[in-house]
Regions:
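Domain-core detector
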Residues: 1-274, 289-378
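Short, solvent-exposed loop/turn segments at the edges of secondary structure
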Residues: 276-278
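Catalytic core of tubulin tyrosine ligase-like
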Residues: 283
């Protein structure tokens, strides 16, 4: 059984963070601050003509990571499938006659293998869609730099160097889009790294929970216990979307009894995207055997949970700002904008101190993996 299942997805997220950074640099390096015809119509036409070369090079960027990412995906999913399984507890349940199937045979079970194969196919397809969106986004980002710079120079709003610096900064700040989702009726663009993080964490937990479900079916287990963590999301009116309300409890898979309510009615699993196993849900479920399993004694105060959830959301916003600054810095280096690089070094240092102080003040763990590693921006 693995305690920190989220850590399994980090190698994949790191790969796609690097891909996004490489794409930003690939776009930026195509612009020369000292171009003699910079900002003219001749320059615009020349740059538009070069877009085909950019498209080929961005495909190469993604392809260069494909073999490594495929192996990491498989390693991640194999570990995730066993993350919710407590073999010692299952063996004790088998010894006491609570289950009739030897748990040692589970790993070679065909149903288990099918769950893993389906998860791998689904996630691979998700990544392909994200990659396609990223390639389209990179092309559009390049075109935006050209067209915006040309208009600003042609209208006399800015000189060529200033226009390029501004356009490159905004391109890097916005990042490369990996997906578009609807939120409250509005379209929301996710960066490549953000889309991969969201979909990978969801897939990993979905696989772990689906494997638990399959395990319960194979063993004839009737109950599951849900994990719990401080900072679980809350909702004032929807009990299924209020993860803090049902986390840490035991539920009956089919039907209910006096002690344990029904799993689906209480958590929405597996169909409700707002509930257990839904988008961005980190909760996991484990086979539970009354009289054998030891219930998790940890219970979180709802007010404290809400406070930590709100603080965590603030921390995520600060991390996003740090990623933006580092992307801007990488792009500025590519065009030789030393002045901007110097300014961004200062801003990055200040933002790092800000995050550090915030985490220490509120007793939160700083997650450097969400800020882009230093070696990623060299």
């Amino acid at each position: 059984m693995i305690k920190d299942i989220d850590s399994l997805s980090q190698p994949i997220i790191n790969i796609y963070s690097q891909i996004e950074l490489d794409l930003i640099k690939e776009i930026a390096r195509r612009f020369d601050l000292n171009d003699e015809i910079g900002g003219t119509m001749e320059w615009q036409l020349k740059k538009l003509d070069e877009s085909g070369v950019l498209n080929a090079d961005t495909v190469k960027v993604i392809a260069s990571y494909s073999e490594k990412s495929e192996q990491e995906i498989l390693n991640m999913l194999k570990k995730a499938q066993l993350a919710n399984i407590n073999m010692a507890e299952l063996e004790e349940a088998y010894r006491q006659g609570s289950i009739t199937v030897d748990p040692m045979n589970i790993k070679t079970n065909s149903a288990f293998a099918e769950v893993l194969e389906l998860s791998y196919k689904e996630l691979s397809n998700t990544y392909r869609l994200i990659q396609t969106k990223a390639l389209e986004s990179a092309k559009q980002a390049y075109m935006n730099v050209i067209n915006r710079s040309y208009i600003e120079v042609a209208t006399g709003t800015y000189d060529y160097q200033t226009a390029i610096k501004r356009a490159i900064k905004d391109m890097a700040k916005n990042g490369i889009s990996g997906a578009t989702y609807k939120r409250n009726g509005k379209l929301v663009q996710y960066s490549l790294e953000g889309a991969v993080r969201r979909d990978t964490l969801t897939a990993v937990n979905k696989l772990a929970n689906k494997s638990s479900e399959t395990l319960c079916d194979e063993l004839g287990a009737e109950y599951v216990e849900i994990s719990s963590h401080l900072g679980a999301r809350t909702h004032p009116t929807n009990p299924i979307a209020n993860h803090a309300g049902w986390q840490g409890k035991v539920f009956k898979i089919d039907g209910s009894d006096k002690k344990y309510p029904n799993l689906k009615e209480s958590t929405g699993y597996p169909d409700d995207i707002l509930g257990l196993g839904g988008v961005n849900c980190r909760h996991r479920m484990f086979p539970f055997f009354p009289g054998i399993s030891t219930p998790n004694p940890i219970r979180f105060n709802e007010e404290e949970n809400r406070r930590v959830y709100e603080l965590t959301q603030k921390q995520r916003a600060m991390e996003r700002r740090m990623r933006q600054l580092k992307k801007e810095q990488a792009a500025a280096k590519e065009i030789g904008d030393k002045e901007t690089v110097k300014k961004l070094n200062k801003k990055i240092s200040e933002q790092s101190t800000k995050i550090d102080d915030f985490c220490k003040k509120n007793n939160l763990r700083r997650d450097h993996s969400r800020e882009l590693f230093k070696e990623q921006i060299k």
